[in-house]
Amino acid sequence: MVVACEVRSVGKWATAFAGLTGTSMLLISVACWALVWAQQQGLPENVMNEVVNPSLLPVGRYQFVAEWEAEKDFAHKIGRKVEDPDASGNAAWEVRVGEDTPNAHALFGPYAKVAPGDYIAFFRIKLLDEPVRDFAFELDACVDYGRRILNSVEVADLDLVQGKFIQIPLAFRLTGSPLECRVFWRGNVSVRIDKVTLFRVEGVGIEQLIRRAPQPKPTGEPKDLPYHFEPRPFPELFPRSKPPAQKLLVADLRPLPADWQFLLFTLQGLVNRQKPQIYFLFNLTDELWLDWLQKRGWVKETEKVPDARALLSWFRSFVKGMVVYDPLLPATKNVATMLCGVEDAVAASPRLAKDLNLPVIADLRDRWRTNAEAYEWAFKNLWAKLNHHVIACAYPDHIGMRDYFVQHRIFIFWISGPVDGARRGGDPNAEVRLMEKLFAQMPVNIPVMSYPWAGQDVGIGEGPGVTLFSEFGKFLVGSINCTNLSVYSGIVIPRLRQKPAPPPPKLQPDKVYYSFIISDGDNLPVLTIGNFPQLWQSPVRGKLPFGWTISPSAIMLIPAVVDYYYATATPNDYFLGAVSGIGYCYPDHYGKRFREPDRKRVFDEFLDLTADYMQRMDLRELWIMGITRPELIRRYAEKISTHRTLRSALGTNLRALFVDYGRRLTDPNSVTYPTANNVAVFHAVTGWREEDTREERINRMVNEIKAMTPTTRPAFLHVFVWNWGFDLEMLSEVAKRLGSEYVPVRPDHLALLYREWLAQQKLLVRTLTQIVAVEETPVSFGMSVFNALGKPAEVGLNVVSGLKEVKVIPAKAKIAVSEEKEFTVVGVPTGEQVRIRLSNGSIVKQVEVPLEQLSQSELAAPLPKGLVLKFAAKFEAEHLAHLSGELRQDERASGKVVWVAERNRAKIGHIVYGPYAPFEAGRYIALFRLKRLSEGEGFIATVDSCVGGGSPVTAEKRITAEQLPIGQFRLVPLEFAHPGGPVETRVFWTGQADLAVDFVALFKVEK
């Protein structure tokens, strides 16, 4: 082992070593081993002896921290304790092929409190089987209970030694606690895990050992594409199966190795292409949906297959041969699936291929160097034989949908992220550039199945992936591991109807009406696997009104599942279309790669498809996200509410749009308003934090609802519910704590009540909740008037008090029916309130808006002269996000509270950041109101602005102790150019002095 180490680490010595005698070689080996060991100071010999290649260990000082036994110090999803004389304590944890469920954690824990620093964990693991040239498991270290992975490594069976324990090192930098170490078993080979030993390391460049690829970055080319259409060879958006056989063969795949599961899913696609006959149990809910098929009469009987592998011989006549994939090049699993669909083959691992006795249609081992090369070959050689109207972005190890992919010959691709892009065959930028080229050659408005994310930094990611698809006029129908689509899609339900609605409550002038909108029903696994099936069983359901989001595509792919929800709904359950229509997309980016006016045509066709399938599912409200442009929100209302199918079928048009994935807007007066055809727009007023406890989530939701409630009554609110983090019992507690002033209603009732109130307003005036200005500095702000009169109106505005040197632009305007007109008011602040008068013949309204003047004496630096500051927003520090710090009372603060970071209590870092609110491109000034609370010197903080998410940083300023006198608030100005999109403002605390943050005021600079 040592000799191999020497030759690998110092390749130029290999030739010289070849002529030495065995004795000479041994002496050199011992000498070199001593050298290596000396460089890893503090690492025990028993650990070093079991590292396959110790020369790759970093040079530095090793300090023992802890040792955890696999069988007693960790939790397990699979496996069992076994005796092993070679293991520490004569016991180990074992997982075996054919006995344990693949793709599950064999080990996770121990959630140990460990100080921040650089570490290497050594996993002691033994291979039990002969290597099959496949991945065995993935090791990682993480914090926040798996939400933040510090480093991971994918281990193939060829990296192990059969019958002998070896030490596998994993380096990471720990910044939080408790620490979790995990072993995720792939199910391809049997292994035993003895223990995990942790060492702290010093004098080591640990970041060099954490392998990360760059986040894939699209080039933006090609662009200005022409509209590209190909007629669909099938009548609906998705290809459908034939009706299922009256008798289904039911087989349980869960006990089988992962490669057998993969093979049988491809077989299911071939067999069910002719007529659905095979139904697999793979997910925990597959029995539930099978029972429903029988209860509704779509399937008359079932026959249990004792061993699913027998199906291969039963249906041998359907199979022309096998495609052997290369387990060490992930893309070959996707290419093999495509070849199976085209060639009527099954996909086989090298291990299975040895014993199957099937003709080899294609052997993909060692065919390509990278994943990108494999996908490019597939497009050039297979695209003409594949379906051009559905594609899939599928992680190669997500196998549950392979039946549908094979059945309908679907093109499959994957774009790696920073983690999987650093592994064998990964090249994220090459992969994304290839897909840009391929997307441009595909028809518009086609669905992308599966999902572009497979874990933290695995895959291009949800946001970047959906953005890329949207730019090319494609939408995502999330469907990771949705099984048996080759069965479900054969069930035909021409139209679904929600149960008759109860009457809405009486509109009361002093109430706040709100609807719980439960997220992610666009994602088919949420409907079929989790969390909706579990939430649906809650005893709270039926006692409170809930809005359940659901994909309009579901009626084609999982009609029986939708039928289950509709049939078992209570009068308090209501369904609305999920983001952002027929599929998940970001309307702000939709069709961006196409030339004008083709971009508008592409988007309008997407809306037409959405309207068609909303009609078929009796959906009258729609949840949308990734949309900040008012004209696009209005386009939804114009197109869908007047769409011929929706109008003729339902009589009443689209009633409401529920906008955003969590709270995005910051002004309570901006979250609810009407748009075209009096369609109500309800922006989300609540968000979430993954790290919150159950109680913190309840409190956060209650506080956000109250903070985002306008002062006027009645009020109407969209309460966004992150389905991954809430259950119905928590929402019941939220309703209880809000009290009787707040009335929960169904989403359709919220829309109807709002329309009733809107009709009473006749002319609806919308202003900001407050205006913030700097003393003696011209300020401008916007307001709008919506015409709900039912006839055209001419409206005039004038400022009564609160400003001097006033201009209103325009002073008068004609407003068409169901149209909104924007007005701009400019002036120098003079009071604490701005009074504005609106007149339209007999209708006269006066609006009062609070005005807060910021003192010139608090400015840490003078503002540029000759500017008008258009007030954009005010972000109270307590309502932004924080990595550290705490809330404190302060009578001189804006809201009587500040966010404080104190030495010895808070952690160095961003104590305030957010809010990711959307703003148009332009020049801005942010005023950070800060106060130093203690002695200090040097740089005590940095303030900056950036596009939401931290990149790019648009401006930053370092703040010294001298700039902030102790005990006095100062307004620190930061000027920046914003490219458009979500704005993030941040305060980074250095720990050099105690610091309080009151708010951040944001202004757009105008001449």
What would you call each of these model-derived segments?
Residues G42-K77, P85, G205-R212, E858-R888:
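Extracellular carbohydrate-recognition regions
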Residues N90-F122, F165, G895-I925:
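Short beta-strands within extracellular/lumenal beta-sheet-rich domains
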Residues K437, M442-Y451, S519-K543, S553, ...:
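Catalytic grooves of carbohydrate-active enzymes
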Residues T483-Y566:
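Active-site beta->alpha N-cap acidic-glycine motif
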Residues V806-G831:
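Intrinsically disordered, low-complexity Pro/Gly/Ser/Thr-rich segments with frequent PxxP/GP/PP motifs
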